[in-house]
């Protein structure tokens, strides 16, 4: 309300075209843009292997992708904005969510959604440590969290779910939804990423949710092999396909292009993510920081 929300502040001085766009495309699903990118899997594989053998560091492909996202946002904060009630807001955090199995050995034990906040000065190792800690916390037996209790509660009475969801939508529309609710739900993050390759599925372009304010969805797919010509010789090259879905209303095409160019650069040269950025750019009146993460227990390979 009055330009402030628990998760952001309304942007002032918007370009007229950007300002009218949410009125032309009022719903997030109206403004979805679907992109495809194939990362060089051989580069990523060699980098992960070197990290393990030379430094004893355990790094995953997903962690590299998330670290690339965080670093690209640190120089292009415009892509981290979101639209609510046809108004443009600067997000006051850099966050990501993804779904994991509570027990990878037993799919019947259900899933858990992991939601993590990052600092824009995070290195690849910081991102890895935050992700490992969050995954470990969600894979141990623990009482139901706030979100699970809330969902179970609203289904206790017939018809209550419809009323409760409508009420939350109304509160969210005017920026007065409780911060504890936004923190618990995975629909209030900058990026949602899914590794469907772990399910033996090809890459997907996942839809954006009209609920909440997720502005980007990334789907990691199964390895692909394609013929390429290098130095006059043809060979089969390995690629990691990524399906990317974005909300075109949050910033200009030029900002998105610069952001995606940075992502491609970091996926081609992941070693650039090992050190903090030289400079961090915050959006309009939205500077934020997160404490340094603790070292993940499983991050270092045992000697």
Predicted features and spans:
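C-terminal catalytic/motor cores of large multi-domain enzyme assemblies
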Residues: 1-303
